[in-house]
Design a protein with these regions (language model features):
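TRNA-recognition modules of translation machinery and tRNA-sensing kinases, especially anticodon-binding
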Residues: 2-143
Length: 143
């Protein structure tokens, strides 16, 4: 997700992006938590950053699956991105970005959280229509 918006709207957009990202994890029914990252840990570009971490049953801890940053006008100033108000004055936009799905990390979260005792895994309900109704993937015996 990428958003360019007016400064007064950037906080609301950041929260909306967080909601969009949360819906993916809720749909997949993967245990997750939201971390409001400390400003000392986000560097100079972002003014606010969330990390979404998914549960790893294998490691018995959370690991990062997605990040969402509100960079306010930092990037826009360097890129010269402005918008014009109706009265003709110009203002730098605020830029926001979010990881949609980090594919390999999401695959790990799905496989770990849906693994069966037999070594296969259950296909999350929300993904079953894309798997032609397949509900479980079982291991194949090799000789």
């Amino acid at each position: 997700q990428i958003v360019l918006c007016k400064s007064q709207d950037s906080h609301a957009w950041h929260e909306r992006m967080l909601g969009n990202t949360e819906k993916m994890f809720q749909g997949l029914e993967i245990p997750y938590r939201i971390v409001n990252v400390c400003t000392g840990d986000i560097g100079i570009v972002a003014a606010k950053k969330y990390d979404i971490e998914g549960w790893s049953p294998r490691e018995k801890k959370y690991f990062e699956l997605a990040s969402l940053s509100n960079c306010t006008s930092y990037q826009a100033v360097r890129l010269g991105i402005k918008f014009v108000h109706p009265d003709g004055t110009k203002e730098y936009v605020h830029t926001l970005n979010a990881t949609g799905i980090a594919t390999s990390r999401m695959m790990r979260a799905v496989l770990e959280n849906y693994q069966t005792k037999e070594g296969g895994f259950t296909v999350p309900t929300v993904l079953q229509p894309y798997m032609y109704g397949l509900k479980e993937i079982r291991p194949v015996e090799t000789r």
